[in-house]
From Swiss-Prot:
One GO CC term on file: cytosolic large ribosomal subunit
Job of this protein: This protein is one of the early assembly proteins of the 50S ribosomal subunit, although it is not seen to bind rRNA by itself. It is important during the early stages of 50S assembly.
Gene: rplM
Protein name: Large ribosomal subunit protein uL13
Similarity field: Belongs to the universal ribosomal protein uL13 family.
Signal peptide extent: none
Disulphide-bridged cysteine pairs: none
GO biological process, one term: negative regulation of translation
Assembly behavior: Part of the 50S ribosomal subunit.
Matching Pfam families: Ribosomal_L13
């Protein structure tokens, strides 16, 4: 019996909707990364993009545990000498694009490379409750019911 290897033409992608309100960011990102990669499927093949399309709503209401809300820093470099910049998670969540906290958490859990970049394009994160993907009829995934540790009261 030969090992099963899925071909790109055989991939069936579903649309998943996750409400991030009250969910712990790291645990949520781990679940999203597995869904994007397709590791939850029996047909998982490491070199094929067979993950699902994931829609995350209420990203601004996701929760960081401990003192990460005030102490966690996100760094980037402008490319100029002395151009290291930083922002705390609090500044990002209270800023214009609070969805970037979840995007960065998931991005750092997906492999870096051409396949990882293609899988990240299947992630759509929205700060509020509205999303333009009603036509895809996404199935709702209740992450809070998967494990009691996935939620944290604010």
């Amino acid at each position: 019996m030969a090992t099963f290897v899925q071909k790109p033409a055989e991939v069936e992608k579903k649309w998943i909707l996750i409400d991030a309100e009250g969910l712990v960011v790291g645990r949520l990102a781990s679940i999203i990364a597995n869904r994007l990669r397709g590791k939850h499927k029996a047909t998982f093949t490491p070199h094929v993009d067979d993950g699902d399309n994931v829609i995350v709503i209420n990203a601004e209401k996701a929760v960081l545990t401990g003192k990460k809300y005030t102490d966690k820093k996100y760094y980037w470099h402008t490319g100029y000498p002395g151009g290291i910049k930083e922002r705390t998670a609090r500044q990002i969540i209270e800023g214009r694009f609070p969805e970037r906290v979840i995007e960065k958490a998931v991005e750092r859990m997906v492999p870096r490379g051409p396949l990882g970049r293609r899988q990240m394009k299947n992630l759509r994160v929205y700060a509020g409750t509205n999303h333009p993907h009603e036509a895809q009829q996404p199935a709702v995934l209740d992450v809070a019911k998967l494990n009691s540790k996935n939620t944290r009261s604010a």
